[in-house]
UniProtKB/Swiss-Prot annotation:
Gene3D superfamilies: 3.30.230.10. One of its GO terms (biological process) is tRNA 5'-leader removal. GO terms for molecular function: 3'-tRNA processing endoribonuclease activity; ribonuclease P activity; tRNA binding. Its EC number is 3.1.26.5. It comes from the Bacteria. RNaseP catalyzes the removal of the 5'-leader sequence from pre-tRNA to produce the mature 5'-terminus. It can also cleave other RNA substrates such as 4.5S RNA. The protein component plays an auxiliary but essential role in vivo by binding to the 5'-leader sequence and broadening the substrate specificity of the ribozyme. This is Ribonuclease P protein component. Belongs to the RnpA family. The lineage of its organism: Bacteria, Bacillati, Cyanobacteriota, Cyanophyceae, Nostocales. InterPro entries: Ribosomal_Su5_D2-typ_SF, Ribsml_uS5_D2-typ_fold_subgr, RNase_P. One of its GO terms (cellular component) is ribonuclease P complex.
Length: 140
């Protein structure tokens, strides 16, 4: 099942901002890049924040999630698409527990295609990465 449109990270500019300024956490199958809402607001809306009304500035947008999977992971698009579907399904399950306003990019490592992991292991690994970056509500 796909992520809701409101939670998809789509623009090249957003991806570049996350790669340039975001936190990085690694696991055996993924690298998670996460950009905090406050740092994103400071870098891109310095002058815009002064012109907007106060209540609009405090409106925190929903968490945006993107998945990056290169041909180095697998030459076959079928394999890459299957992994991407498993990741988006796992992120959709975790979506209600995510703090609002974050921009997240999940980068898939080649080990994800080599090991025949199920979506349950992907879910567990993503949950650990999100807890490390303190994106999950109730992280410890």
């Amino acid at each position: 099942m796909a992520l809701p449109k409101a939670n998809r990270l789509k623009s090249r500019h957003d991806f570049q901002a996350v790669f340039r300024e975001g936190l990085r956490r690694n696991s055996s199958h993924f690298t998670l890049r996460a950009l905090k809402p406050s740092s994103a607001r400071k870098s891109s809306l310095d002058t815009a924040a002064q012109t907007q009304p106060v209540d609009e500035v405090q409106n925190i947008p929903s968490t945006l999630i993107g998945v990056s999977i290169s041909t180095k992971v697998s030459k076959r698009a079928v394999v890459r698409n299957r992994i991407k579907r498993q990741i988006t399904a796992a992120m959709q399950q975790l979506l209600p527990r995510l703090a609002p306003g974050w921009k997240l990019v999940v980068i898939v490592k080649p080990t994800a295609a080599e090991s025949k992991c199920g979506s349950q292991q992907f879910l567990q690994e993503l949950e650990q990465l999100l807890a490390q970056t303190e994106v999950l509500h109730g992280h410890s």
